[in-house]
Amino acid sequence: MDSVKKYLYTCDHVGFLELTKETWKNRWFPSQVPLQGDVCCVDMLNERDLEFYKFLFTFLGMAEKLVNINIEDLLSQFDSHDISHYYAEQMAMENIHGKVYANILNMLFKNNITEVYSYACDIMNDSALQEKLRWLNGRVTEASDKAEKILLFLLVEGIFFISSFFSIGLFRVRGIMNGICLANDYIARDEMLHTSAAALLYNTMTKSSERPSEDWIYKLFREAVEVEFKFIAAKGYGVSLVNVHEIRQFLQATADRILESINLNPIYGSLPPENCPLAYTSSTKSVNFFERDNSDYTGTLTNDL
């Protein structure tokens, strides 16, 4: 009987079944992100801006693969059809994100793939990126149980890309890079769902007795916010419209929201900045379907940003 249950699908987690359905309804593809109109915008970027966004998109492009490696490691600890099905869908979406980032990099580097690879090798030695990776690797090494590993995964999904999304969203404020802005909408919304899934995994698949203390969790969140802030601050000063103090405020507000999603009190009491560019991704937009695809999710999601 157990062997039959292993291979024959039956619903064993309603929450993850619903998340899987949400993913099915909102699947999108790289072909839906037109970048032709963005090509002329590349020359509008000054040298400082271009270097900043080359760095961000190279980091994001490589990070997608790392996320999938983490998912594979995490899944080995669960025996659930619905959890496996959902994360198979998430891994597929991460691959789509990686393809879109590759398309954007090809545009920024004028289709010189050799230069893209060389640049990617160079930034692996960047001090800001190294500090971020050292913190994460150290915490992963120290994680002694399932609950701690899920919390780290939750922070990666919810904190470690958000300052990049914020900075990319500023293109819309400048009125340039419409294709990149659409991609950022899609990807930021996917990450909303992924963060909700990680919180659901923690809330439903760990026992209270297995979870670390609140003090441990708060310390982890404070460290993650500070590491992510230092990362974007090291690269973002002097970039057009990038206000690192607003990004810190947004990181704190995001950390508070994630804490509440796992039934803990907020620690910062911060709200997103009034002019947060990611507000566009959570508001209802009037879409002209002759101009571009609709990036609004069909279902109702709690704003994870």
Curated annotation (Swiss-Prot):
<dbReference type="GO" id="GO:0004748">
    <property type="term" value="F:ribonucleoside-diphosphate reductase activity, thioredoxin disulfide as acceptor"/>
</dbReference>
<feature type="binding site">
    <location>
        <position position="194"/>
    </location>
    <ligand>
        <name>Fe cation 2</name>
    </ligand>
</feature>
<feature type="binding site">
    <location>
        <position position="191"/>
    </location>
    <ligand>
        <name>Fe cation 2</name>
    </ligand>
</feature>
<keyword id="KW-0472">Membrane</keyword>
<keyword id="KW-0812">Transmembrane</keyword>
<feature type="binding site">
    <location>
        <position position="157"/>
    </location>
    <ligand>
        <name>Fe cation 2</name>
    </ligand>
</feature>
<dbReference type="GO" id="GO:0046872">
    <property type="term" value="F:metal ion binding"/>
</dbReference>
<dbReference type="InterPro" id="IPR033909">
    <property type="entry name" value="RNR_small"/>
</dbReference>
<feature type="active site">
    <location>
        <position position="101"/>
    </location>
</feature>
<feature type="binding site">
    <location>
        <position position="97"/>
    </location>
    <ligand>
        <name>Fe cation 1</name>
    </ligand>
</feature>
<feature type="binding site">
    <location>
        <position position="94"/>
    </location>
    <ligand>
        <name>Fe cation 2</name>
    </ligand>
</feature>
<keyword id="KW-1043">Host membrane</keyword>
<dbReference type="InterPro" id="IPR009078">
    <property type="entry name" value="Ferritin-like_SF"/>
</dbReference>
<keyword id="KW-0408">Iron</keyword>
<keyword id="KW-0479">Metal-binding</keyword>
<dbReference type="InterPro" id="IPR030475">
    <property type="entry name" value="RNR_small_AS"/>
</dbReference>
<feature type="binding site">
    <location>
        <position position="94"/>
    </location>
    <ligand>
        <name>Fe cation 1</name>
    </ligand>
</feature>
<dbReference type="InterPro" id="IPR034715">
    <property type="entry name" value="HSV_RIR2"/>
</dbReference>
<dbReference type="GO" id="GO:0009263">
    <property type="term" value="P:deoxyribonucleotide biosynthetic process"/>
</dbReference>
<feature type="transmembrane region" description="Helical">
    <location>
        <begin position="150"/>
        <end position="170"/>
    </location>
</feature>
<dbReference type="InterPro" id="IPR012348">
    <property type="entry name" value="RNR-like"/>
</dbReference>
<comment type="subunit">
    <text>Heterotetramer composed of a homodimer of the large subunit (R1) and a homodimer of the small subunit (R2). Larger multisubunit protein complex are also active, composed of (R1)n(R2)n.</text>
</comment>
<comment type="function">
    <text>Ribonucleoside-diphosphate reductase holoenzyme provides the precursors necessary for viral DNA synthesis. Allows virus growth in non-dividing cells, as well as reactivation from latency in infected hosts. Catalyzes the biosynthesis of deoxyribonucleotides from the corresponding ribonucleotides.</text>
</comment>
<comment type="similarity">
    <text>Belongs to the ribonucleoside diphosphate reductase small chain family.</text>
</comment>
<feature type="binding site">
    <location>
        <position position="64"/>
    </location>
    <ligand>
        <name>Fe cation 1</name>
    </ligand>
</feature>
<keyword id="KW-0235">DNA replication</keyword>
<keyword id="KW-0560">Oxidoreductase</keyword>
<dbReference type="Pfam" id="PF00268">
    <property type="entry name" value="Ribonuc_red_sm"/>
</dbReference>
<keyword id="KW-1133">Transmembrane helix</keyword>
<dbReference type="GO" id="GO:0033644">
    <property type="term" value="C:host cell membrane"/>
</dbReference>
<protein>
    <recommendedName>
        <fullName>Ribonucleoside-diphosphate reductase small subunit</fullName>
        <ecNumber>1.17.4.1</ecNumber>
    </recommendedName>
</protein>
<dbReference type="GO" id="GO:0016020">
    <property type="term" value="C:membrane"/>
</dbReference>
<dbReference type="InterPro" id="IPR000358">
    <property type="entry name" value="RNR_small_fam"/>
</dbReference>
<dbReference type="GO" id="GO:0006260">
    <property type="term" value="P:DNA replication"/>
</dbReference>
